[in-house]
């Protein structure tokens, strides 16, 4: 079951990308993935890891790095879901990854595997996206190619969200004042409901 689920998540393709990653950088990536799963950090800092890769001459695109991060997060969360031992995990990966990478995975799983399995049992392992940050500001439209009525205030809302793999993305919304008031009203309603729980 464990191996089939990893195949369904596309881990085979991730394994080919992992082979070019130096063990020390791979260890940092694994550590951030595990911390994200344990809710100790809001996400994996893909940009900082990418810069580290570039600094040591590892030629990989940001998209390929995101695939590695998703793959490692999936590996650890799936291994926790099936409560696999370190030997079971390594026996499944031995034909797919180099020895140095397997040593990193062994170290990380020996250190954190038990805790991840406990979190999985209590359903506290990060299953989906998480709101990391929320910013808003009010502005005034003074020029536009598509808008005829200018000099109207608007609100820009930026939501930073970490997906299940820890990748942080920003979503920006521009709302009119009535739309923002409705948005605010809905958040107040949610807050009132949460206070009764």
Swiss-Prot record:
GO biological process: signal transduction
Domain COMM: 130-197
Pfam families in alphabetical order: COMM_domain, COMM_HN
Molecular function per GO: NF-kappaB binding
Subcellular location: Nucleus; Cytoplasm
Keyword list, A-Z: Cytoplasm, Nucleus, Transcription, Transcription regulation, Ubl conjugation pathway
One GO CC term, this protein: nucleus
Family the UniProt entry places it in: Belongs to the COMM domain-containing protein 6 family.
UniProt function note: Scaffold protein in the commander complex that is essential for endosomal recycling of transmembrane cargos; the commander complex is composed of the CCC subcomplex and the retriever subcomplex. May modulate activity of cullin-RING E3 ubiquitin ligase (CRL) complexes. Down-regulates activation of NF-kappa-B. Inhibits TNF-induced NFKB1 activation.
Subunit structure: Component of the commander complex consisting of the CCC subcomplex and the retriever subcomplex. Component of the CCC subcomplex.
Protein name as annotated: COMM domain-containing protein 6
């Amino acid at each position: 079951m464990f191996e089939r689920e990893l195949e369904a998540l596309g881990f085979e393709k991730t394994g080919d990308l992992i082979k070019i990653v130096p063990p020390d950088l791979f260890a940092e990536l694994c550590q951030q993935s595990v911390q994200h799963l344990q809710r100790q950090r809001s996400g994996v800092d893909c940009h900082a890891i990418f810069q580290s890769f570039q600094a040591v001459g590892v030629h990989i695109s940001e998209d390929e790095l995101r695939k590695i991060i998703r793959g490692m997060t999936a590996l650890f969360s799936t291994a926790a879901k099936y409560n696999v031992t370190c030997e079971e995990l390594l026996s499944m990966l031995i034909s797919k990854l180099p020895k140095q990478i397997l040593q990193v995975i062994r170290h990380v799983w020996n250190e954190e595997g038990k805790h991840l399995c406990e979190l999985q049992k209590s359903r506290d392992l990060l299953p989906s996206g998480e709101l990391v940050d929320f910013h808003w500001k009010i502005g005034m439209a003074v020029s536009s190619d598509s808008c005829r009525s200018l000099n109207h205030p608007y609100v820009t809302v930026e939501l930073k969200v970490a997906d299940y793999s820890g990748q942080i993305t920003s979503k920006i919304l521009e709302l009119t004042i009535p739309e923002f008031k409705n948005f605010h009203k809905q958040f107040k309603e949610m807050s009132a409901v949460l206070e009764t729980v």
